[in-house]
Amino acid sequence: MPIGVPKVPYRSPGDKHPSWVDIYNRLYRERLLFLGQMVESDISNQLIGIMVYLSIENETKDLYLFINSPGGWVIPGIAIYDTMQFVRPDVQTICMGLAASMGSFLLAAGASTKRLAFPHARVMIHQPIGAFYGAQTGEFILDTEELLRLREILTMVYVQRSGKPLWVVSEDMERDTFMSATEAQAHGLVDLVAVG
């Protein structure tokens, strides 16, 4: 039996009695954001809107982005990345479960010294993948050029955020490279591994 999104009591400032709100809205009020699905346009726009709103509300208090994502689309992910860099508050990133593909990109995008992985988390990086099936030759070439541009963007961000040389990051992106939390820390994708 589906229960929907759990509801929790929340008292707005100035209210005498709490009202019931869905748990995510309550957590957003505490500046806790969640990426627990594939990265695509809807979740990207939702996270961007919440980050912008909360940064307008208080530009000095950190935001916390919890990530458990198998990855997803590159452009919506880059939009989240750009917003994380644009908003004034630091965005702390926390990997719980899996941060793969675009999930690992966003994990690495957190504020320097404020990127954390839970002890049993897994992180995976790889090169962006295109959807060329059924494409005409001309479309295929244009898609390939765009894919190469996107790969260059992702690679350079990983280099900047990890502190690793270009050749190391490029080599790791050639295939699916899975890492434990401590390996991700050694690779420069997170700064801390939580102690259980």
Swiss-Prot record:
Reactions the enzyme catalyzes: Hydrolysis of proteins to small peptides in the presence of ATP and magnesium. alpha-casein is the usual test substrate. In the absence of ATP, only oligopeptides shorter than five residues are hydrolyzed (such as succinyl-Leu-Tyr-|-NHMec, and Leu-Tyr-Leu-|-Tyr-Trp, in which cleavage of the -Tyr-|-Leu- and -Tyr-|-Trp bonds also occurs)
Class in the EC hierarchy, top level: hydrolase
UniProt main location, coarse: plastid
A molecular-function term among this protein's GO annotations: serine-type endopeptidase activity
Subcellular location: Plastid, Chloroplast stroma
GO cellular component, one term: chloroplast stroma
Pfam families, sorted: CLP_protease
Keywords tagged on the record: Chloroplast, Hydrolase, Plastid, Protease, Serine protease
KW Cytoplasm (keyword) present: no
GO biological process terms held by the UniProt record: proteolysis
HAMAP family: ClpP
Subunit: Component of the chloroplastic Clp protease core complex.
The protein's name in its UniProt record: ATP-dependent Clp protease proteolytic subunit
Gene: clpP
